[in-house]
UniProtKB/Swiss-Prot annotation:
Cofactor annotation remark: Binds 2 magnesium ions.
TM helices/strands, residue ranges: none
Protein's GO biological process: mRNA catabolic process; NAD-cap decapping; nuclear mRNA surveillance; nuclear-transcribed mRNA catabolic process; nucleic acid metabolic process; RNA destabilization
Binding site for substrate: R69, E114, W149, R150, G151, C235, E252, K273, Q298
Protein name: Decapping and exoribonuclease protein
Gene this chain is encoded by: dxo
Comp. bias (Basic and acidic residues): 7-20
EC number: 3.6.1.-, 3.1.13.-
């Protein structure tokens, strides 16, 4: 999202800061740009109620991205959970997750915006998997209402409780299917460009943590001296349903558990996380409010049942491991002051998807509806035909046509 933008865009992208007086998870009041009758409110109290129907995802495919970020229709980059014996739970391994930052770290180029590229590549190579759906006398080549990344849905789920970072989501309706792709806001780009060395090292530490407990095959041990290359990844492609909305979701999977009782994906997958060591009640409350919210959203959406977290000392060493069951996380925060409610997250997501269906009415691969939100505001949208906003490349459009 480069170049000159209107004053409206500049207002959308202005970051909001959490001050010490903001103890509630409710977004602060803000002066919001271009409110309209087609806007969607995000106040969490509006979405309280029973948990909506969500059919847990079933995996229909997968793909790998190699060290050069090239797509492969296989599982060559799937890793296997292999923690050292004796420290699977509550251990103190002492791993140095800053080790290798200067010499064994290959960063993905974050200036190259991939959008939906890899999902669309999978769809183009697996057209027969989804079949065709007859609706109103016409066939949909992709038998899903929505196609998107897990990370985009995570942002939507967290919106009622988010107090700092806004988002931009581009939506195109093509052949009866809505494609959702995140656009980087100017505030997010500025934040990324201005990361400190400490922030860069903390990002690295999460990847390095994974290298201590993941092996390349079930019969191998983790290689602690391996190069950390963030170009690499294994992604699952899954089908799910939220009330009336059928979804095709793809998300990166950290590893699979070869000892899992159920070996069918995604129930055998494990999400790996690292976080700062919790040393006092204030840090525990902050962890429960913000980290556990995002962790739950990420894992629940893909149907990943287990999260293994490594807690990091100020010196950069893993001092403890803890396993969380995704289904238990909402119970851990229930009853806490200013806590979050998973039903609110899912109800808002359901409403937002319905909102998209109500306003994105023109079926045109060149047309983009850009939904914008910042804390304290309603979700609004603008419509664009400029090529810079296009999210469906011509090769994909031609393959579907």
């Amino acid at each position: 999202m480069e170049g000159n933008k209107s004053m409206q865009r500049e207002k959308i992208d202005r970051p909001m800061k959490r001050g010490p007086e903001q103890n509630s998870l409710s977004p602060p009041l803000a002066k919001c740009p271009f409110m309209s009758c087609s806007s969607l409110k995000t106040l969490h109290s509006l979405y309280q109620g029973s948990f909506p129907f969500y059919r847990l995802p079933s995996e229909v495919g997968h793909f790998s991205l190699d060290e050069n970020r090239q797509y492969h229709q296989d599982n060559r980059k799937l890793r296997y959970y292999s923690p050292p014996v004796g420290i699977r739970e509550k251990g103190s391994p002492g791993w140095n997750v800053m080790d290798g930052y200067e010499s064994h770290y290959v960063r993905r180029n974050e200036d190259e915006k991939e959008g939906l590229l890899h999902i669309l590549t999978w769809l183009e190579k697996n057209r027969g998997v989804l079949g065709a759906h007859v609706e109103g006398g016409s066939k949909r080549p992709i038998d899903r209402d929505f196609v998107t990344w897990r990370g985009h849905l995570t942002k939507i789920l967290c919106t009622p409780y988010e107090t700092q970072e806004g988002w931009l989501l581009a939506v195109t309706l093509f052949k009866g299917t809505f494609y959702i792709s995140e656009q980087e806001t100017e505030a997010a780009q500025k934040k990324r460009k201005e990361r400190s060395l400490e922030q860069e090292r903390l990002m690295y530490s999460g990847y390095k943590f994974e290298s201590y407990i993941c092996a390349d095959s079930p019969d191998r041990q983790p290689s602690q001296s391996a190069v950390v290359n963030t170009n690499e990844g294994f992604c699952s492609v899954l089908l799910a349903r939220l009330t009336s909305h059928s979804l095709l979701i793809s998300g990166e999977v950290d590893c699979t558990d070869p000892s899992a009782k159920k070996s069918i994906p995604p129930t055998c997958y494990i999400e790996l996380k690292s976080s700062a060591q919790i040393r006092n009640p204030h840090q525990q409350r902050s962890f429960n409010r913000y980290k556990l919210l995002k962790w739950w959203c990420q894992s629940f959406l893909l149907g990943i049942p287990i999260i293994v977290a490594g807690f990091r000392s100020p010196e950069g060493r893993i001092v403890s491991l803890e396993t969380f069951k995704t289904s238990d996380i909402p119970h851990l925060v229930r009853g806490e002051r200013n806590s979050w409610d998973p039903a609110v997250c899912m109800n808002f997501c359901n409403k937002f998807l319905s909102h998209i269906k109500s306003v994105v009415t023109r079926d045109d691969p060149r047309l983009v509806y850009l939904f914008a939100w910042e804390p304290g505001c309603d979700v609004t949208f603008t419509v664009h035909t400029d090529p810079e906003y296009t999210i469906l490349p011509s090769w994909y459009v031609n393959s579907v046509n």
